């Protein structure tokens, strides 16, 4: 029994949800998203709530039950409020700036790193040491933030690099004399 899967997903106000077989479509003020559920689960729209049930009691069906429910909840929240991920840059000379739609990062390399913003994602740089990635697709926002962080992840000795705003870097002690 999936604890997450058995909870019905409430459709928020201002969002219209449509279930067509295995395809769940959500349309809201921020845009439109869809999710195609696996054949192991059944999806129904009842009284402004989306109910996900496993087709049978196989282990595979139970595993996809909770995941499908969470994905549907994510698209409903995304089209209403959207998602954002904040990144911080630490280090002398490390900074970020926007050049048109591209993000330019100075991260201590011999060249600046230019990251092209994908479709459906908005990147903002309120301060040279702060990056805000936002969009309606939770997976895509997280992936873009992870790709930016990957250019120069935080190192444990001085804490230099790109890190998530809520991330805590465990610092190591330097070598002793």
UniProtKB/Swiss-Prot annotation:
HAMAP family: Ribosomal_uL6_B (MF_01365_B). One of its GO terms (molecular function) is rRNA binding. GO terms for cellular component: cytosolic large ribosomal subunit. This is Large ribosomal subunit protein uL6. Part of the 50S ribosomal subunit. Belongs to the universal ribosomal protein uL6 family. The keyword RNA-binding applies. The gene is rplF. GO terms for biological process: cytoplasmic translation. Gene3D superfamilies: Ribosomal protein L6, alpha-beta domain. PROSITE patterns: RIBOSOMAL_L6_1. It comes from Sinorhizobium medicae (strain WSM419) (Ensifer medicae).
């Amino acid at each position: 029994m999936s604890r997450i899967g058995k909870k019905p997903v409430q459709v928020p106000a201002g969002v219209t949800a449509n279930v067509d077989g295995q395809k769940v479509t959500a349309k809201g003020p921020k845009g439109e998203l869809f999710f195609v559920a696996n054949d192991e689960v059944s999806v129904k729209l009842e009284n402004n709530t989306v109910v996900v049930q496993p087709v049978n009691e196989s282990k595979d069906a139970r595993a996809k039950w909770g995941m499908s429910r969470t994905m549907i909840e994510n698209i409903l929240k995304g089209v209403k409020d959207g998602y954002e991920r904040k990144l911080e840059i630490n280090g002398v000379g490390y900074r970020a700036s926007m050049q048109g739609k591209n993000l330019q990062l100075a991260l201590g390399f011999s060249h600046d790193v230019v990251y092209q913003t994908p479709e459906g994602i908005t990147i903002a740089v309120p301060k040279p040491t702060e990056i805000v990635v936002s969009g309606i697709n939770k997976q895509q926002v997280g992936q873009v933030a992870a790709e930016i962080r990957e250019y120069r992840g935080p190192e444990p000795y001085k804490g230099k690099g790109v890190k998530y705003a809520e991330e805590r870097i465990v610092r190591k002690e330097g070598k002793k004399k």
